[in-house]
């Protein structure tokens, strides 16, 4: 009887310890989320200014559709940029993003996927792991962008996507 009591107490202690660890992890993830939200808020003025500048350029360009980025072309090679977190401490966010990406591939880009003309740029470890396990063509050059998130890092990613489109690697 006393052995069972000791075992129950040990289990209770173990559960309490796990609860403490979980609470600490929640606090750490909340702090990181807040830091990421602050970084995004700080980038908003840059993004709106960039959007304004691009609008001015397109509207001031004679026949604006002559620009490489504005030209319409048949979709042959697809680039899908999937942004997930590095860890699973964000509720259903990663699962929802992955489901949405899979649904988009199935509904819009099934032919490109079947012919091997679909590439996924995975930003965040969870998305990279998810799509690699399922055999998708995953480019992980920006997978660790959240390790040191900055405007410069995001800018490099955006420039790479624009350059790939301009060079007609992707449509």
Task: State what each model feature region is.
Residues 2-171:
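Conserved loop-to-helix interface motifs that mediate assembly, gating, or partner/ligand docking
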């Amino acid at each position: 009887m006393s052995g069972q009591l000791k075992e129950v107490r040990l289990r209770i202690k173990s559960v309490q310890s796990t609860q403490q660890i979980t609470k600490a992890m929640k606090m750490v993830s909340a702090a990181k989320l807040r830091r990421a939200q602050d970084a995004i808020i700080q980038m908003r003025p840059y993004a709106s200014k960039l959007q304004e500048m691009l609008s001015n350029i397109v509207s001031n360009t004679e026949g604006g559709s002559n620009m490489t980025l504005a030209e319409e072309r048949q979709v042959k090679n697809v680039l899908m940029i999937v942004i997930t977190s590095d860890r699973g401490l964000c509720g259903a966010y990663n699962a929802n993003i992955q489901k949405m990406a899979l649904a988009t591939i199935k509904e819009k880009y099934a032919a490109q996927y079947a012919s091997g003309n679909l590439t996924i740029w995975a930003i965040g470890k969870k998305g990279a792991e998810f799509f690699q396990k399922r055999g998708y063509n995953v480019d992980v050059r920006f997978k660790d962008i959240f390790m040191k998130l900055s405007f410069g890092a995001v800018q490099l990613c955006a420039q790479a996507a624009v350059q790939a489109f301009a060079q007609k690697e992707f449509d």
